[in-house]
């Protein structure tokens, strides 16, 4: 929901992320509640779940005001990637100047299972979403990528049921890793597969 600044797929907003990066208040829950308030029935709405992650646009483009007080206190509010991080993604086959989309199967195969362990996995318990960091040239963690995993998919499925939504849709099946996300979604929604 944040897309260019923070998480690509947050279910809820998170107080862990400061306002310095000009992020907005959007989350899946915010959008669903606004549609419901506008009169859309829950039975008319599906929740979209991406079987991919995104490097935030903020990571590859300058533009954050680093003079603000909370700018240096959080991995998400760092300067954009330097040559080291751009080269790291390029070595894995990603030209971040063209696209910041990373399929879930590549997140698992190339990032989470990186033999050099250059990525660290995190979980934001307020936003209900996983994210990865990489090290800066100074050794500080830099927010690198947000994505869905089986845990976040199960939580979103519970949300769908609790809100009485029509169901879920996802993009894209071919990006899944050995059907982990599709299987989790089906199981959590009570769909036999």
Regions picked out by a protein language model, each given a short descriptive name:
Residues 1-98:
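Substrate-binding surface in catalytic domains of secreted glycosidases
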Residues 73-75, 93, 99-100, 114, ...:
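Short, flexible coil/linker elements and helix-boundary hinge sites characteristic
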Residues 111-193:
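Extracellular low-complexity, Gly/Ser/Thr-rich intrinsically disordered linkers
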Residues 16, 39, 84, 98, ...:
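Generic alpha-helical secondary structure signal
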Residues 92, 103-110:
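Membrane-proximal ectodomain caps of single-pass cell-surface receptors
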């Amino acid at each position: 929901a944040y897309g260019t600044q923070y998480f690509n797929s947050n279910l809820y907003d998170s107080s862990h992320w400061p306002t310095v990066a000009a992020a907005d208040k959007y989350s899946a829950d915010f959008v669903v509640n606004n549609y419901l308030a506008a009169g859309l029935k829950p039975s008319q709405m599906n929740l979209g779940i991406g079987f991919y992650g995104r490097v935030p646009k903020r990571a590859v483009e300058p533009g954050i005001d680093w003079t603000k007080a909370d700018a240096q206190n959080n991995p998400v509010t760092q300067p954009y990637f330097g040559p080291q991080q751009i080269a790291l993604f390029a070595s894995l086959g990603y030209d971040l100047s063209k696209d910041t989309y990373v399929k879930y199967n590549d997140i698992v195969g190339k990032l989470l299972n990186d033999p050099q362990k250059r990525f660290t996995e995190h979980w934001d318990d307020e936003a209900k979403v996983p994210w990865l960091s990489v090290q800066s040239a100074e050794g500080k963690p830099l927010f690198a990528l947000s994505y869905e995993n089986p845990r976040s998919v199960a939580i979103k499925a519970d949300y769908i049921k609790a809100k009485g939504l029509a169901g879920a849709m996802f993009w894209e099946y071919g990006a899944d890793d050995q059907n982990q996300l599709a299987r989790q979604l089906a199981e959590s929604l009570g769909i036999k597969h």
